[in-house]
Amino acid sequence: MSELSTRLEAYLRHKLDAPDLTVADLARIPGGASRETYRFRARYGGKDRGLILRRDPPASLIETERTTEYRAYEAFHGLGLPVPEPIALELDPRPLERPFFIMEEIENCTTGSIMAPDPFGPHREKIGQQFYTVMARIAAADPRDVGLSDFEGETDIHAVAMHEVARWEKVVEEDEREPQPIVRAAIRWLKRNPPPPAQKISVVHGDYRTGNFLVDNDGNIRAVLDWEMSHLGDPLEDLGWAIDPLWSGGNVAMPGGMLPRDEAIRVWEKASGLKAEPKALHWWEIFASLKGAAIWISAAREYAEGRNTDPINAFSGWYCLAFHNKVLADRLGARA
């Protein structure tokens, strides 16, 4: 048994008041630059349960707060959305060297690859209907009702867009290792062309896209994952991010490999009770590509400076940044 398994076993025996608990089959799950992710079996009291450990890495692609992610899991699992059940949050680094949390594993499921031209095959329409409906239910939820009204973010519907631009402009300023003229041009355009005020302030998932949810063999979405960037904001932020071309496997007419764009928007509008006004959504789509570029700029720096040498950071800093620079250049050129 590895040292991590031994320490995890000791922690869970105390946390769950289960002196007979044993940890087995602990294995690192590849990917995930903001948290180290492991799966394992916890056996105690006649149970054999699959669990997931999410531990802070020595360095992170983006600065995220594990308490935020855990609370989002709690809130939306409690609301009945397909979200894993959270089990334990530990901010004390002593048990496992770094803060971490534990949640249930959703078994016998897969994710869709953003590199595949048809990631969901015959289930694409069924999955798409669920995907945009779940996103809409997140948008429709009142942050006060789900206990997340104190989340980070701007609560003024007139100021929320510029708040998010400033947030990601700061990331670019802190992490760029070489000039980023296209990104800077996008920031200027977003500032000079503000969108209409937000219709409401919602909990924004922050990374709602293909690759961040699990589906079973029957095409049912079983879990929405990776809530570490969740915050308060304009619900159109999630919609703009979800339909970004990067997640479309080369088929921009089928965002995320699921539904045609117009149908996706209709599903979201119907389920959320909100409107994706074209001018506002266009602004948030350009913002989405800026946000992506800022994240990939951070990835490149983390990898180049040796703080996080996960290959996903090298890929993101190379391919994804170039992709979003091209998207931004095309979109800004079309607006000229």
Identify the meaning behind each predicted range.
Residues M1-D20:
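Juxta-kinase regulatory segment immediately upstream of eukaryotic protein kinase catalytic domains
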Residues L21-A27:
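Conserved N-terminal boundary motif of the eukaryotic protein kinase catalytic domain
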Residues A27-A185, W189, N193-K200, G219:
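ATP-binding pocket architecture of kinase catalytic cores
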Residues V203-H205, T210:
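Catalytic-loop of the protein kinase fold
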Residues L225-S230:
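Activation of the activation-loop gatekeeper triad in protein kinase-fold domains
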Residues L236-G273, F287-G306:
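Active-site activation/catalytic loop segments of kinase-like enzymes and analogous catalytic loops
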Residues A294-A336:
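Helical subdomain adjoining the active site within ATP-dependent kinase catalytic cores
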